[in-house]
Design a protein with these regions (language model features):
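Glycine/serine-rich phosphate-binding loop and adjoining beta1-alpha1 elements at the start
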Residues: 100, 119-233
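General beta-strand structural signal in soluble alpha/beta enzymes
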Residues: 110, 164-168, 191-196, 239, ...
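Rossmann-like adenosine-cofactor binding region
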Residues: 268-369, 374
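Flexible, glycine/charged-enriched surface loops at secondary-structure junctions
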Residues: 24-27, 45-50, 123, 160-169, ...
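Structured beta-strand/loop patches that form or line metal/cofactor-binding pockets in enzymes
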Residues: 46-77
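Glycine-rich phosphate/diphosphate-binding loop of Rossmann-like nucleotide-binding domains
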Residues: 197-200, 205-315
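Adenosine-phosphate binding glycine-rich loop
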Residues: 2-29, 224, 339-451
Length: 451
């Protein structure tokens, strides 16, 4: 059986790569899932007969479009927009919109594929999608971001809706951008519906939505730590990134008793051996969310911190690492440095931040390691809760949302334990998350026929 499964994986991947040449991020995401579920698939021949995996890796729809806009000098720019609607077997498409220079079709497909499994893990009725553009808001004025967002939504609005596809924010798309996108959708469609999530509290948003992904990472980490009778109390924590996910993961870890000593951005990282405090976190919120400055300014504000330009934080000794920046930020050397530095728990806040060879290092060392599709699902879970609140024209209290977020992250952890516990007791969270998500989506696809 094992040899057959291995041959099945290689044949499957050869065909996928031939059909999708040059899409290395998409290949990487698919291989991780296929390797995890191959034994399960070959054990149940009807899954092979129905070609479930072959159907899962083929998007139901890909929309690619031009986005023309003018800058403040009147100069015309053309960017490229995407929406990959991967799978709607268990609900309307759901997934973020990313505005970043690195955006391309491969990254959109990888993110939409990951989103399908992540959304299935939440147990909420949401399919998988992802969208975005190679436009970067960095260095742009509010007016330029607004004009771009309005142009982007002028095309995207044809393909989305509260029961069809519900986008949200992602890298480069925060509350400001969601506001501009929602305003243009409402203007064109003449309707006020829950078509986007991550909205402002005064116009259909959910309490705790900004905090949800970062908080959810820590709630999931608590469940992982409990399997080894550990907690955050007194632990040294590395956080990469300084955007939404990193900010709230750092804040929650700190409030759970950990000492958070790093934050980063694309230019480098800061190391504060004394650890973040509530006052320092408020400075980070103002720096990144209001002034949209660079993390090096933290070290200028707090002389006890050291700024490392052009580097990542993984060389710093720690107990727990929370990668919350971007895909493939932890390579093999970084993983070995983490292990050598005493790290025993890695919980992903970003999407696919760990390269396959680094995952192998973690699993060989028997670290607690969770993939983002499980541990960062709190964001989309709370987006799903926002959809529910919009449907009933109601707004829950922060306590209600937090309780639901806790429950969902705990349930995801239980699913990972069910399908990922190895014979020796080691918990393979990658395998557990992939099989749990796969089973739910596969069963729905079979029930709905060949569509």
């Amino acid at each position: 059986m094992e040899k057959f499964a291995k041959n099945y994986v290689e044949k499957f991947m050869d065909e996928l790569v031939a059909k999708n040449p040059g899409e290395k991020e998409f290949h990487q995401a698919v291989r991780e899932v296929v390797e995890s579920v191959a034994d399960y698939v070959v054990e149940y021949p009807h899954l092979m007969d129905q070609k479930i995996l072959e159907r899962m890796v083929e998007p139901e729809r890909v929309v690619m479009f031009r986005v023309p806009w003018t800058d403040d000098r009147g100069e015309i720019h053309i960017n490229r927009g995407f929406r990959v609607q991967m799978n709607s077997a268990i609900g309307p498409y759901k997934g973020g919109i990313r505005f970043h220079a690195s955006v391309n079709l491969s990254i959109m497909k990888f993110l939409a594929f990951e989103q399908t499994f992540k959304n299935a893990l939440t147990t909420l009725p949401m399919g998988g999608a992802k969208g975005g553009s190679d436009f970067s808001p960095r260095g742009k004025s509010d007016a330029e971001v607004m004009r771009f967002g309005q142009s982007f939504m002028t095309e995207l609005q044809r393909h989305i809706g509260p029961d069809t596809d519900v986008p949200a924010g992602d890298i480069g798309v925060g509350g400001r951008e969601v506001g501009y996108l929602f305003g243009q959708y409402k203007r064109i469609r003449d309707e006020f519906t829950g078509t986007l999530t991550g909205k402002g509290l005064g116009w259909g948003g959910s309490r705790l939505r900004p905090e949800a992904t970062g908080y959810g990472v820590c709630y999931f980490a608590q469940e992982m730590l409990a399997t080894r009778r550990e907690t955050f109390e007194g632990k040294t924590v590395l956080v990469s990134g300084s955007g939404n996910v990193a900010q709230y993961a750092a804040q929650k870890a700190m409030r759970l008793g950990a000492k958070v000593v790093t934050l980063s951005d694309s230019d480098g990282f800061v190391y504060d051996a004394e650890g973040l405090t509530e006052d320092k976190m408020q400075y980070v919120f103002e720096l990144k969310n209001v002034r949209r400055g660079r993390i090096r300014e933290y070290a200028e504000k707090y002389p006890e911190a050291v700024y490392y330009p052009g580097e990542r934080p993984w060389k710093i000794a720690c107990d727990i690492a929370l990668p919350c920046a971007t895909q493939n930020e932890i390579g093999e050397d970084d993983a070995e440095a983490l292990v050598k530095g005493g790290c025993f728990c890695v919980v992903e806040g970003a999407n696919m931040p760990t390269r396959p060879e680094a995952i192998a290092v973690f699993q060989k060392s028997r670290l607690l390691y969770s993939p983002g599709k499980a541990s960062n699902a709190g964001g989309v879970a709370t987006s799903g809760l926002e959809m529910s609140q919009n449907s009933i024209r109601n707004q829950w209290t922060a306590e209600q949302v937090d309780n639901e977020l806790h429950r969902i992250m705990s349930d995801i952890h239980k699913a990972c334990l069910k399908y990922g516990t190895e014979p020796d007791g080691y918990i393979n969270y990658v395998k557990g998350a992939n099989i749990a998500g796969f089973i739910k989506v596969a069963n729905a696809m079979i029930d709905q026929g060949l569509v």
